Design a protein with these regions (language model features):
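C-terminal motif of bacterial Sec signal peptides marking the signal peptidase cleavage site
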Residues: 25-28
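Short acidic, glycine-rich surface-loop motifs adjacent to enzyme active sites
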Residues: 218-237
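Bacterial N-terminal signal peptides that target proteins for export
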Residues: 2-16
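A short C-terminal boundary segment appended to hydrolase-like catalytic domains
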Residues: 303-355
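Short, low-complexity, disordered segments immediately C-terminal to signal peptides
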Residues: 30-55
Length: 355
């Protein structure tokens, strides 16, 4: 059985599009200092603030997520395009949450392009979306945040969609360089901004410290961990991109706390790694190590591979689609790639970690 098919008898919590959206509230502001443990938080750059939050859904429940990045081509408004079919397929599957993995609108996510193009095909998904930003297409510098910040807050001129689930839960806009995290059932989700390594290394280093504190607190609460960031570290090379070595400090922290899986995009193809350590060594499914998914098949042009790292165990570059994940209370998870244009797919289960 694969993602979105088995639920181990658990009753899945409905996604309420309120401040809590069934997952707990978050706070967002600029600040400094070491945060107290909290179920959820959002920060600007690398400085973290926290606030009390309520229950984040039963820890006995399986959580159903969809994930994809690299979505809409310049000028496209067609619901029957590849990206339109991906969006429709996600909505038909009725996930509780959609993780947007960055690069939403090409070539540049300005307010006008997002409203006039992106929202025509992805607007109905926005209320379900938690999101991270990709550098260049979503923002180009620390002073280039308006399109991303305003669109996901639902405040671009002429916008009739949004705000996103993430912004709605926070009651405040979220910028492309912001950190966010939250508990979802037995799991803890984190969103990072790889653009900071290009645009403001000081903030990227601060975010590394924030990540370390956040994962330590989540681990102490007994949570299983998922981290999303746009530019992948564990990936094959294409004619445009190779592994993003700048994010290695984050990979070290991810390895330190035995994060179960990461989600990235950017490469315009699909990949899955073995459970892998920061040293590039594969480990058993029930051991430590992170399963790294690259899901950048949301509708923009696909790219072939020019090498094959030994840790990549499944990949293809000929099929548009999205990844379904079922995160179970014992730390196991199922995945299934849903093809919508093309026929390649991937599915499986990683069992619960050994105690």
């Amino acid at each position: 059985m694969t993602a979105f098919q088995r639920h181990r008898g658990a009753t899945l919590p409905a996604l309420a599009l309120t401040a809590a959206i069934g997952l707990g509230a978050v706070s967002a502001c600029s600040g400094s200092g070491t945060p107290a443990p909290t179920t959820s938080t959002s920060t600007s750059g690398g400085s973290q603030s926290s606030s009390p939050s309520g229950p984040t859904g039963s820890t006995a429940s399986t959580v159903r997520l969809a994930a994809v990045g690299d979505m809409n081509n310049d000028g496209n408004t067609s619901p029957t395009s590849a990206t339109g079919e991906v969006a429709s397929s996600i909505l038909a599957a009725n996930p509780e949450l959609v993780l947007g993995l960055g690069d939403y609108q090409y070539p540049k996510g300005t307010c006008s392009a997002l409203v006039e193009d992106y929202d025509k095909v992805w607007g109905k998904v926005l209320p379900l979306m938690f999101h991270i930003a990709g550098p260049n297409h979503d923002w180009n510098s620390t002073s280039d945040e308006e399109g991303y910040r305003r669109h996901f807050a639902g405040t671009c001129p002429g916008q009739t969609t949004g705000p996103s689930a993430l912004v709605r839960s926070e009651h405040t806009p979220v910028g492309p360089g912001d950190f966010w995290s939250r508990d979802v059932g037995a799991w803890h989700l984190v969103g990072l901004s790889t653009g900071l390594w290009r645009f403001d290394q000081g903030k990227a280093e601060a975010m590394t410290r924030t990540l370390d504190r956040d994962l330590a607190a989540a681990k102490a609460r007994g949570k299983y961990l998922l981290v999303a960031y746009h530019d992948p570290y564990f990936t094959s090379t294409t004619d445009q991109h190779g592994p993003d070595k700048a994010v290695k400090p984050w990979v070290d922290v991810i390895d330190k706390y035995d994060v179960r899986l990461t989600l990235s995009a950017s490469q315009h193809n699909y990949e899955r790694s073995c459970p892998i350590l920061e040293s590039d060594a594969c480990t058993p499914d029930t051991g430590p190590g992170t399963t790294a998914f690259n899901v950048s098949t949301g509708g923009v042009n696909l790219r072939s591979f020019v090498n094959k790292p030994p840790y990549i165990v499944k990949r293809f570059s000929d099929t548009y689609g999205w990844l379904a994940l079922s995160l179970h209370p014992d730390g196991s998870f199922d995945w299934r790639y849903h093809p919508v244009v093309g026929s390649s797919t991937d599915s499986g289960t990683r069992p619960a970690p050994r105690e």
